[in-house]
């Protein structure tokens, strides 16, 4: 019984992130910005790559936009690194719509200030967790 509950919870979590990933351009291909790590940051709106727990500023802004990719949300710089959310997600012109193909690839993480080792970004990223166990 415990195994069934665990599998159900895992499926629910994975499905939830996939659902949200489809609502932003390249949501399933956001690069992991942590030094020495590679792969995809699956929980784009969260402080840990695997998702869950607290939202990062991008996740908070996503919720504030009604979970809709709007021109305003696209043009916003949620992580304060000088690059708009759209630019980092491959939609610099903010023309992407769900189900469409973004004009480019995701070049950064819209919820993690980069470069992470800069003094500005270290302060902005104080709640971001870079731990290998958190990556997908």
List where the protein language model places each region:
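Calcium-binding acidic motifs and repeat modules
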Residues: 2-80, 86-136
């Amino acid at each position: 019984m415990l195994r069934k509950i665990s599998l159900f919870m895992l499926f629910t979590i994975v499905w939830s992130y996939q659902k949200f990933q489809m609502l932003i351009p390249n949501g399933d291909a956001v690069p992991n910005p942590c030094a020495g790590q590679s792969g995809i940051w699956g929980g784009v709106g969260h402080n840990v790559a695997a998702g869950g727990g607290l939202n990062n500023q991008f996740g908070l802004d996503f919720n504030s936009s009604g979970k809709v990719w709007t021109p305003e949300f696209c043009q916003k710089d949620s992580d304060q690194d000088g690059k708009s959310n759209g630019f980092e997600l491959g939609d610099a012109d903010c023309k992407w719509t769900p189900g469409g193909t973004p004009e480019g690839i995701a070049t950064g993480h819209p919820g993690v200030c980069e470069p992470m080792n800069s003094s500005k970004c270290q302060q902005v990223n104080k709640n971001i967790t870079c731990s290998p166990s958190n990556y997908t």
